[in-house]
Amino acid sequence: STILNIVKGDTLLLQRTVPYGTNAVVTEVMDEKGVDATTAMTLLQNERLVTVDFDDNAATGAFRYLINNVGRVIDYYVAKNPDKPIDDVFLTGDGALIRGIDGLFKIQLNIQTKIMDSLYNVKFDPKIDLKIYNPVYLISPIGAAFAPMGFRPSEVKSKTGGNTEYAKYCAAAMG
């Protein structure tokens, strides 16, 4: 599934879960190429199998439900908040590493789309292999460590002293 967050500054305006993700396109490539899931994802990341039009090929068409559902969430948000337009879409996670996904989102949703493949002002230890630990996977945990949203049961908060110590712990655990 895919989690959509609409954020302005440091305020979460809307969060929705869409029950579609990269599974459909990975399955399509597996069937078409006769490969396993890992190889299919590698092909999607290294070859331009995804274009900007759903009708170009089956792999691109497999994103139709995901993008249509994202579009519905965006339409809902815009209808409820006409004074707060969405300027950009930022992609993270496995799907963000698929070549051409940003162009597909941009054309189909008519919104500027960017892949969050780097973290500004974050320096990694040179020993960390960024090909394995790609920054697109680290955005959520790093964000949660620096600015937790407070989604923790009260009994856990009382044992740890609140969110501040939790944020320090997460930041320390990430190294």
Predicted regions mapped to residue ranges:
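Hydrophobic/aromatic-enriched cytosolic interaction surfaces used to assemble or bind macromolecules
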Residues: 1-175
